[in-house]
């Protein structure tokens, strides 16, 4: 138990000693600010593939289930 407490203490104080500033873009910071990154489901609006949930592609501004890897025709 003492080893665990010591380890946590070192992790907390290490950035203070090295002079690092904590990032506001950390996951815990996002949770505290209420920022959530969610994915769009099938049929929902999207702009790019990364906005759709896993295994889906963005085509025609809507997410759809992809049988194969996402591809886009050059228009």
UniProtKB/Swiss-Prot annotation:
Propeptide: 20-36
Cell compartments where the protein resides: Secreted
A GO term from the CC aspect: extracellular region
Tissue-wise expression: Expressed by the venom duct.
Source organism, top-level taxon: Eukaryota
The keyword Secreted appears for this protein: yes
GO MF annotation terms: ion channel regulator activity; toxin activity
Principal subcellular localisation of the protein: secreted
Signal peptide: 1-19
Paired cysteines (S-S): 39-53, 46-58, 52-63, 57-70
Record's keyword terms, sorted: Disulfide bond, Ion channel impairing toxin, Neurotoxin, Secreted, Signal, Toxin
Secreted recorded as keyword: yes
Comment field on protein domains: The cysteine framework is XI (C-C-CC-CC-C-C).
Family of this protein: Belongs to the conotoxin I1 superfamily.
Biological role stated in the UniProt entry: Both natural (L-Leu form) and synthetic (D-Leu from) peptides equally cause sensitivity to touch and body tremor. Neither L-Leu form nor D-Leu form is active on nerve-muscle preparation.
Protein name: Conotoxin ar11a
The organism's taxonomic lineage, starting at the top: Eukaryota, Metazoa, Spiralia, Lophotrochozoa, Mollusca
């Amino acid at each position: 138990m003492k080893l665990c407490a010591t380890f946590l203490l070192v992790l907390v104080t290490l950035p203070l000693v090295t002079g690092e500033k904590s990032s506001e873009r950390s996951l815990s910071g996002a949770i505290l600010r209420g920022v959530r990154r969610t994915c769009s489901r099938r049929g929902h609006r999207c702009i790019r593939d990364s906005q759709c949930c896993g295994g889906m592609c963005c085509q025609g501004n809507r997410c759809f289930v992809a049988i194969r890897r996402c591809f886009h025709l050059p228009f």
